[in-house]
């Protein structure tokens, strides 16, 4: 198969800021640390070794193991859950909203890219372990962005009113939407496989978080992808000092404002 690669600039789909970053423009160097090239990960690994406490690591590993107690998981997932306890294990994390049926295709691209990066890093740095993580944005409140998906030029929407975190939404009223979608699929082999996936994710789950967790695990569990549900008391406890710092000093807000002003002065978007 012949492959043709198109540069980000040629697509005309990305901002000048994005393409300048990807081309490692010198004017942007002050605004980030290491560019994520394979070679730079060597230094990044050394930096991360000293920035994450073993206590936090053990809490994370224990919490994730608990989250998988009710989920059928693969040998690859079990292996990576155990590897998280080791100090020479590092995570590559992607995140996305709980889009219905995965929603836009970049939901899948993000996860595939994360898994592939872990494989490449393991080849280059065999003495370290790399675990792909999908962080569920279960606390997001924008239901409109996750409530629909497209299939064969049809926009299939979940007509539902909701307030609060989308991850906590009950799936009781989703069943008619699933029925309609399955009718559109037909009865061929791939359709039957997809219906089976729906049955083992959305049909048996009580909340959108649980369904998305199960769906992503079915699709990518064999590749060792770990799904993390952030709405967990143990993980929130680790977040307390950071939240306290932000509420009392506004550290990240102040830093972001300063960076934006510096960016305006030091980068020409035209």
Where are the regions that the model predicts?
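N-terminal targeting/trafficking signals and adjacent low-complexity tails
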Residues: 1-113, 117-270
